[in-house]
Amino acid sequence: KPNPERFYGLM
């Protein structure tokens, strides 16, 4: 499952 924290880190 994709972690939102990591997703935001890419931004």
From Swiss-Prot:
Record-level GO cellular component terms: extracellular region
**Keywords, alphabetical:** Amidation, Neuropeptide, Secreted
Point out the coiled-coil segments of this chain. none
**Swiss-Prot/TrEMBL GO biological process terms:** neuropeptide signaling pathway; tachykinin receptor signaling pathway
Q: Which domain of life is it from?
A: Eukaryota
Its subcellular locations are: Secreted
Functional note? Tachykinins are active peptides which excite neurons, evoke behavioral responses, are potent vasodilators and secretagogues, and contract (directly or indirectly) many smooth muscles.
Which family is this protein grouped under? Belongs to the tachykinin family.
Q: Does the keyword Secreted apply?
A: yes
Q: Methionine amide modification sites?
A: 11
Question: What protein am I looking at?
Answer: Ranakinin
Please state the protein's primary subcellular location.
Answer: secreted
